[in-house]
């Protein structure tokens, strides 16, 4: 038990309580609501754009994540804010003796119009929250301050003084998850001594739907198209000391540094957006589900910002959990029972493990000065460049999990 709750005073209840109103939590609440059970979403409402700090962070969503948003009936409100990513370009700008060749992955090689879409985090959360407020029984604008779990239910005390109960608790409350702590789930962390800057900028040349990952010895710069053809979002990863210095530069000097790092790839740079600095870490929950609690998104796993895996992984968590609960409902079973939690662990384990290991290995290989590792990375890159079938296979593996997609994410699903 975390905190103290008067069980006798609880008045509001639901089959499922989802804690966290970020993108993954809202998607989880909507997906679970769609399978026919009562869901309460708990967390703060999005800030009013007029009073909130400028938010320039974006999310690159794969096609399967977009399909999920369509099933949840929110994509129509988002597509005008989204930019298609048609090409992913990887550039090795290191000074390695065994430098890897530049590679372009094209969605058209898979018969796709785009790998996915890049969209503002603020727009994504606003549309999801509006939909949740419309279709869910309750969306409570309060934080969870204490949680107690017994054999048949989960009890939550909220910051507004209210108390609620549910049979399944979904923890979508991020890296410092109170849900994870209350369920007694420990974590393993992977420090990288890196930080990142998220921002946006304007550029003289058209981006043409191309996302570029430019890798150097100590980090990377990734640009992702925005709806304006002369604007892109930015993730700059580097040593903590370097990122701290870059954050302190005025806009003009930062633009000069960015232009130098990109080598004029997108033409003259201007119109730098607000910059947000965040640590680059890796985190894995030691189990995805226990004690009537299922973890999704960053409560379960945190990855370095490479390959746009993080949020897409969280969306697959949410959709897979909805599948597991749907099976339980058809069989008239407890949605928070041990069999449902075990089913969720099986459904998500391999996908999360392969993505976590893959991103960790790639990040460490980019930082390593060990010549055999550099040689291996260069050899793989040469193979990808020279062998189209291998390149197509890698693209498919990057976009979809090794196991079957959850039902709400399958193309053509109802």
Language model: regions and residue ranges:
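C-terminal helical "tail/cap" subdomain of flavin- and related membrane-associated enzymes
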Residues: 323-414
């Amino acid at each position: 038990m975390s905190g103290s709750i008067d069980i006798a005073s609880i008045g509001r209840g639901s089959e499922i309580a989802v804690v966290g109103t970020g993108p993954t939590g809202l998607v989880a609440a909507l997906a679970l609501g769609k399978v026919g059970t009562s869901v309460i979403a708990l967390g703060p409402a999005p800030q009013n754009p007029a009073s909130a700090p400028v938010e320039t962070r974006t999310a690159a969503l794969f096609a399967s994540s977009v399909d999920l948003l369509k099933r949840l009936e929110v994509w129509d409100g988002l597509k005008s804010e989204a930019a298609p990513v048609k090409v992913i370009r990887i550039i090795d700008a290191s000074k390695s003796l065994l430098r890897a060749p530049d590679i372009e992955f094209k969605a058209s090689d898979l018969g796709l119009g785009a790998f996915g879409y890049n969209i503002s985090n603020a727009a994504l959360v606003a549309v999801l929250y509006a939909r949740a407020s419309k279709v869910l029984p309750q969306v409570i604008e309060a934080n969870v301050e204490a949680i107690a779990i017994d054999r048949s239910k989960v009890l939550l005390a909220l910051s507004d003084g209210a108390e609620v109960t549910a049979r399944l608790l979904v923890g979508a409350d991020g890296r410092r998850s109170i849900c994870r702590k209350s369920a007694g789930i420990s974590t393993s962390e992977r420090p990288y001594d890196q930080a990142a800057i998220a921002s946006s900028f304007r550029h003289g040349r058209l981006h043409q739907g191309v996302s570029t990952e430019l890798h150097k010895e100590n980090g990377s710069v990734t640009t992702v198209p925005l709806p304006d053809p002369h604007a892109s979002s930015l993730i700059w990863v580097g040593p903590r000391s370097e990122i701290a210095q870059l954050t302190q530069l005025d806009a003009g000097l930062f633009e000069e540094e960015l232009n130098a790092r990109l080598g004029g790839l997108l033409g003259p740079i201007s119109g730098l957006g607000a910059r947000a600095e965040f640590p680059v870490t890796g985190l894995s929950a030691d189990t995805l589900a226990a004690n009537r609690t299922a973890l999704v998104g960053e409560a379960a796993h945190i990855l370095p910002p490479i390959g746009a895996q993080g949020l897409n992984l969280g969306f697959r968590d949410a959709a897979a959990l909805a599948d597991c609960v749907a099976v339980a409902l058809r069989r008239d079973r407890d949605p928070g029972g041990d069999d449902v939690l075990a089913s969720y662990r099986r459904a998500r384990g391999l996908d999360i493990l392969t993505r976590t290991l893959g991103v960790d290995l790639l990040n460490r290989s980019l930082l390593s000065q060990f010549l055999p590792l550099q040689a291996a990375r260069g050899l793989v890159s040469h193979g990808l460049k020279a062998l189209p079938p291998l390149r197509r296979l890698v693209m498919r593996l990057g976009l979809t999990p090794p196991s079957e997609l959850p039902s709400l994410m399958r193309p053509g699903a109802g």
